[in-house]
């Protein structure tokens, strides 16, 4: 297998608005990130993916960009960004930029021009269609609720926005649009960034017939079959690779919701000349109800395990996995997949990390995950800031599909704001995130969960993550070893072996709050070394009773 730096890296995702505020305005910023580079170096991560920091009206927290070559004023200046790059590189840390090119903000100069008239030179930068029978061109619904089309009275036409109406979709069929994007990417690569995480990149190619979508319990049709992994997607990404990516030593990861194993190989196969890896969301999207993620049901562990094993086995040797359990769009991983009850929070956070970091692929740590930060469980609608949560609350309650009480429970479990509360640095007011009033409330458990306390405690979640990351740097088997699943049908245990030449590694995790019984594979009963354990287990007999949420890793050469 070909060795590359991005296969051997551990990526840390920063959501800049909530990471560290350096000037007391309640909003995280670039100087705040610079202040914390030594903390990140101590953790051991060597790549930072930073969510968008470019000029934006912040309708969707920066995923609505109004200028691709300017830093958002509340985050700082271009000079600050250049300092961040230099300081990170000095510490051996690379920087990935969040590339948002499925859509722009409606305040981007291209769109301001585009909507002026039907013959404006920028008209074809976006997707405009005539009304059909005085209504929307088709029945597609947007990701954040409502129609995916917005009527513009000035020219009596509709524009497409798969996300909010302030996020009009770019028309990738137009070669001028593609040139603009590639020029902009080259601009940032020349500045010295180390790669791109590509936001909803699988949506840039649309079926130009724009047919109606299937109605799935909602008010609108599903655009998925016509604009996710669309007809020209691989042609566009190959062109992007030729025009930009192949010229630099950069890392790329595409956000590709709904991707299959076969499709992932097209995006990220070694011989494809498109991307290095993709984010698949199959394990994240399990446990959906009639209205997608808006449900109070727990996830199905066996289904989760089956999906994780499938991606390990079927992508092996063909494309590279991205390993993650959380990001800025998901609830906190310890609340979703572990147990955030204080009795089990730390051990289940360590167990989840063990399970993920011993697999083949590039692991991603979302800010605060290394501390075991939990969902915030806001119980008042006015505390929420997330556009998706607020849109769906209105849509699903006003149409009588869900009661306000039930929808509040769904938000507490599934809202994106769970991941967006401020980073918990210490026990001071504002959790050390800000000296001012934070843009969103701090999780009240910052007194118990914070970086300052964990840095002092050798048994903390932070130090456990640090050790997992160090092991990955030291041992090729963790990065490149083959994967073999054990206990496929067990209701509680997730266990697997990794192999590289004469070396073997066994990872065992109990995903439940009950004890679980297992037999060690014979190879590991004698002379195996315990690399890491979340409960200090010393004795590894043939028969083992695992404690709730226990995890350990054994190594044999």
Q: Predicted regions: what is each one?
A:
Residues 1-529, 533-557:
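Active-site and adjacent substrate-binding regions of carbohydrate-active enzymes
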């Amino acid at each position: 297998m070909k060795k590359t730096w991005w296969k051997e890296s551990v990526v840390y995702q920063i959501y800049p608005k909530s990471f560290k505020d350096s000037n007391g305005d309640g909003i995280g910023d670039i100087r705040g990130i610079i202040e914390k580079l030594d903390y990140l170096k101590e953790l051991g991560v060597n790549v930072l993916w930073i969510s968008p920091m470019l000029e934006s009206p912040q309708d969707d927290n920066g995923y609505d960009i109004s200028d691709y070559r300017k830093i958002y004023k509340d985050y700082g200046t271009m000079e600050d960004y250049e300092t961040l790059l230099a300081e990170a590189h000095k510490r051996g840390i690379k920087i990935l930029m969040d590339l948002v090119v499925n859509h722009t903000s409606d305040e981007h100069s291209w769109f301001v021009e585009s909507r002026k008239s039907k013959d404006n030179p920028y008209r074809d930068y976006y997707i405009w269609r005539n009304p059909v029978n005085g209504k929307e061109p088709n029945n597609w619904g947007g990701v954040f609720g409502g129609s995916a089309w917005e009527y513009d009275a000035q020219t009596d036409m509709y524009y497409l926005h798969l996300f909010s109406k302030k996020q009009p979709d770019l028309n990738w069929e137009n070669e001028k649009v593609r040139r603009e994007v590639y020029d902009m990417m080259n601009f940032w690569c020349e500045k010295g960034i180390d790669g791109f995480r590509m936001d909803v990149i699988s949506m840039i190619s649309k079926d130009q017939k724009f047919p109606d979508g299937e109605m799935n319990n909602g008010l609108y049709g599903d655009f998925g079959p016509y604009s996710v992994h669309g007809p020209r997607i691989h042609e566009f990404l190959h062109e992007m690779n030729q025009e930009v990516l192949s010229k630099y030593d950069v890392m790329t990861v595409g956000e590709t919701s709904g991707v299959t194993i076969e499709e992932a190989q097209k995006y990220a196969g070694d011989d494809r000349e498109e991307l290095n890896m993709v984010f698949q969301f199959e394990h994240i999207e399990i446990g959906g109800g009639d209205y997608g993620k808006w449900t109070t049901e727990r996830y199905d562990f066996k289904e989760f395990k089956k999906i994780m094993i499938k991606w390990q086995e079927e992508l092996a040797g063909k494309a590279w996995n991205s390993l993650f359990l959380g990001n800025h769009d998901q609830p906190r991983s310890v609340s979703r997949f572990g147990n955030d009850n204080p009795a089990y929070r730390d051990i289940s956070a360590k167990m989840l990390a063990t399970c993920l970091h011993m697999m083949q692929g590039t692991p991603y740590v979302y800010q605060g995950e290394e501390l075991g930060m939990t969902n915030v469980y806001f119980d008042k609608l006015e505390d929420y800031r997330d556009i998706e949560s607020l849109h769906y609350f209105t849509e699903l309650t006003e149409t009588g599909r869900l009661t306000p009480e039930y929808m509040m429970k769904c938000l507490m479990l599934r809202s994106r704001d769970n991941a967006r509360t401020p980073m918990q640095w210490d026990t001071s007011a504002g959790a050390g995130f800000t000296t001012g009033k934070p843009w969103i409330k701090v999780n009240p458990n910052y007194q118990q969960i914070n970086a300052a306390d964990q840095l002092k405690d050798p048994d903390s979640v932070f130090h456990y993550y640090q050790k997992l990351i160090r092991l990955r740097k030291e041992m090729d088997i963790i990065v490149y070893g083959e994967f073999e699943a054990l206990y496929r049908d067990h209701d509680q245990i997730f266990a697997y072996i990794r192999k590289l030449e004469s070396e073997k590694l066994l990872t065992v995790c109990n995903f439940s709050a009950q004890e679980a019984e297992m037999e060690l594979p014979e190879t590991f009963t004698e002379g195996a070394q315990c690399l890491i354990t979340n409960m200090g287990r010393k004795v590894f007999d043939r028969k083992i009773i695992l404690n709730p949420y226990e995890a350990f890793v054994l190594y044999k050469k």
